[in-house]
Amino acid sequence: MSCQGAVSPKGARKLHDADVVYLYDGSFEGFLCCVYESFAQHELPFAVWTPQRETATLYPVKDIATDPAVARRVFASFGKKLGAETEYLVSRDFLSGQEDKELLLLRFLHLAFALGPGTVKREGHPVVAPLYAMKKSLDWEVDKFQGFVRFEEHDGMLGAVIHPKNYILPLLRPHFCGRFPEEDFMIYDAVHQAVLLHEKHNTRLLELAAPLELPPPSA
């Protein structure tokens, strides 16, 4: 079944709640493959977990492999069939720290593909409202950390440690790279074990396998 066919409501069987858990790698591409599986099987899983959130369950666990080609087709269908506003909202809300974000996004996408691109504007709908609540939390936290990140010098580089609820480093990147274009700096997200590293005019987002300890601040 093609990806575009999987996300089309035309001729689709009725969506059903499935006693199954999706397990994926935690990446946005991996989530898009969960979207594909959900539409292909016409099912809404009981839960969607990453390896970090995996726990004991009586439900069967379905491993969802990350396929970049499938992910690209699914994402392209958002803009083509649902519009840029939906594409933006889903992408941004995936950065939320809310544990059930994947299920909330899946429910919304099933509704949006059934009702059309105007679904995203129905902010009071019980399926749509949680997405705007996640966006509000993200926006608030981005504004907060844009103004309150405290840097110290560590071996010639500015460094800061933050503890955000949401994964906001990608959203902080434009602000701090614009603010300190000539400086070498790093922002370490101790909650999500990720680093925004700006060095010699190059910027990278790095996911770490273990917690990072910064050296003592320079005297």
At which residue positions do the language-model features occur?
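Ampiphathic alpha-helical segments that act as solvent-exposed interaction surfaces
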Residues: 36, 180-182, 211-219
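Glycine-rich loops and low-complexity Gly/Arg-rich segments
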Residues: 46-49, 72-75, 184-188, 210-214
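N-terminal ordered "arm"
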Residues: 2-3, 7-68
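Acidic, Ser/Thr-rich peripheral helices and adjacent loops at domain boundaries
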Residues: 61-74, 202-217
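Charged, alpha-helical interface segments at or near domain boundaries
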Residues: 49-144
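Short, hydrophobic/amphipathic alpha-helical patches that form generic packing surfaces
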Residues: 30-41, 106-111, 174-178
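Internal, well-folded beta-alpha domain core
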Residues: 118-210
